[in-house]
Amino acid sequence: MVVHLGTLIAVAASESQQRPPRVRMTGSERRHQLINIARTLFAERGYESTSVEEVAQRAGVSKPVVYEHFGGKEGLYAVVVDREMSALLDGITSSLTNNRYRPRVETVVLALLTYVEERTDGFRLLLRDSPAAISSGTYSSLINDAVSQVSSILAGDFSRRGLDPDLAPLYAQALVGSVSMAAQWWLDVREPKKEVVAAHLVNLCWNGLTH
């Protein structure tokens, strides 16, 4: 079998064009790039269907570079999830500055929707089941934290109104549960505006269907 030199050159050129060019980066820049690529892949395909090889290929580096930064796929996934959890929790925590109960709850809801809007891949990632080896940093654990915070807010409001504060956890579960489901729905439709969604969700839980 005779292979012409011109054919070999053409094939090599084609393969070179298909590979993303390797850009020289600092260690921190490369790490940030790998995290962003992995976040997109994990959000689209989940943990099991994402490979270190594909992350490396999209970044234009070899697999050892990924292992050098994260130790493996599990380590990479843990870093990505931890960053998304931190981003969401920071947004929620910073919204808890209003001393009035209802506006404070509404700003928490709006903070979640803002995260969904600005970090869509991150939210999709958090909604996916984490591998068994990574027990922390799951969306369910975040929801539990949110229930605890909202329960504390509602308990204070119930006491002020002369209502039984022991019922606050029940209402907190209902509020956070409805907000969580609505956020997952809004993730795809993006209508109406997040401010309108937040206002209606809080009004529904605060006043019921009569208002």
Language model regions located:
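N-terminal intrinsically disordered/low-complexity leader segments
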Residues: 1-29, 158, 165
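Hydrophobic alpha-helical connector segments
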Residues: 79, 93-118, 172, 198
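Amphipathic alpha-helical packing segments from all-alpha helical-bundle domains
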Residues: 86-89, 135-160, 169-173, 196-199, ...
